[in-house]
Amino acid sequence: MDLSVTAGPFKRSTITALAAALGLAGALLSGGAHAEGKISIAQQFGIGYLILDVVQQQKLIEKHGKEQGLDIKVDWNSISGATAMNEALLAGALDVVSAGVPPMLTIWDRTKGKQNVKAIASLGSMPNYLLSNKPDVKTLNDFTDKDRIAVPAAGVGFQSRTLQIETAKLFGNDNFKKFDNISVSLPHPDATSALIAGGSEISAHFSSPPFQYQELENPNVHKVLSSYDVLGGQATFNVLYTTQKFHDENPKTYKAFYDALAEAEKIIKADKPAAAKTYIEVEKSKLPLPLVEKIVSDPEIDFTVVPQRTFIYAEKLHELGVLKNKADRWKDFFFEEAHGGAGS
């Protein structure tokens, strides 16, 4: 089990899928059941987590906790892939996890009437691009059995579910898993290196910011599809979610966390160049600052805690039989603190 802690001012444990699955991380991190004033949070890799980077750097949870007379201890962790996130949350190893909308809906569906997992807030709307380094792959129709599409969590993650919705649209609901057999699980940084280098079995990558921008700087890489094409416009990429137990038993900690997220959104929108620097500092990114500034300022991207087009996933994934429970509206799978905005 590898539970390494990154060095430097921003410490974030890295939990492997095995540790998460076995719940061993619970012995090393703050456990799921505890009194007010503790929160353990996990995020994945990429600029989709910028709101959390700002929250961490500026200690906004601690700040909003103090406003309620509460000293909050925050544990920050990194996990790659939604499957490991969900296992860690249910094992009680983590209080709050983050992933794309579809993995959150999967665990909402699985735990309805039990742990009652729901979303806390959006981490922003941003497109995810399906990229290829093969000139002849221009549409989904051009993929063959020899191709391999890299995704963070094959079959179940945001990228795979988005691809399945588009596949159902093109090839019919019965064939929605058509591309699952050529999808392979690979963390974004590794998939990015493989696609840029070429010469490996990876001929496509359903990417996300900042990786897709990095890949598109290579002349051999081109865009095949955007998640915005699939969803009909600007849509939430990642969300934060937790159990009903944590939400109900830690009202002050939860409020401090939600208020911290809302403040981070305002901070990013007020000074995007500073937010770009925060990303590089907290994530220890080697990306050039001008590229990160370009991404943060991209009009396609909106760092907002308000959910956008999340209900499309709930509707489509229920239609495809992925979700057993039918949501009537987006508020069914978000805790009430998020209900105030003009969400969808």
Where are these regions (language model features)?
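Hydrophobic helical h-region of N-terminal Sec-dependent signal peptides
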Residues: L18-L24, L28
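Conserved C-terminal helix/tail region of periplasmic/extracytoplasmic solute-binding proteins
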Residues: L317-S344
